[in-house]
From Swiss-Prot:
PANTHER family: ACYLPHOSPHATASE. The keyword Hydrolase applies. NCBIfam families: PRK14430.1. GO terms for molecular function: acylphosphatase activity. This is Acylphosphatase. Residues 3-88 form the Acylphosphatase-like domain. It comes from Cupriavidus pinatubonensis (strain JMP 134 / LMG 1197). The keyword DNA repair does not apply. Its EC number is 3.6.1.7. It catalyses: an acyl phosphate + H2O = a carboxylate + phosphate + H(+). It comes from the Bacteria. The active site is at R18, N36.
Length: 90
């Protein structure tokens, strides 16, 4: 089990990205959280197998139809999670 901290850049707010990301994470069995950031990015802390995390990162790069994802930054994360939550904007 690994934990990744991922940040999506581009047109990722106001397009259903956060909710879609949560749905994808839950479908993949990933635990953690997603939230919008005041700087216009979407931040994810996700815990799962490497295969689950790579699949979520691939979803994040594609995003929902209305999104335009410029890039997704990935770095090691931390935390233990029971489920996957939508968090308020920070």
């Amino acid at each position: 089990m690994e934990t990744w901290h991922m940040t999506a850049h581009g047109r990722v707010q106001g397009v259903g990205y956060r909710a879609g990301c949560a749905q994808a994470a839950i479908a993949l069995g990933v635990r953690g959280w997603v939230r919008n950031r005041a700087d216009g990015t979407v931040e994810v802390m996700a815990s799962g197998t490497i295969q689950q995390l790579e699949a979520l990162r691939n979803w994040m790069q594609a995003g929902p139809p209305a999104a335009h994802v410029a890039r997704v930054d990935v770095e090691p994360g931390q935390g233990k999670f029971e489920d996957f939550d939508l968090r308020p904007t920070l």
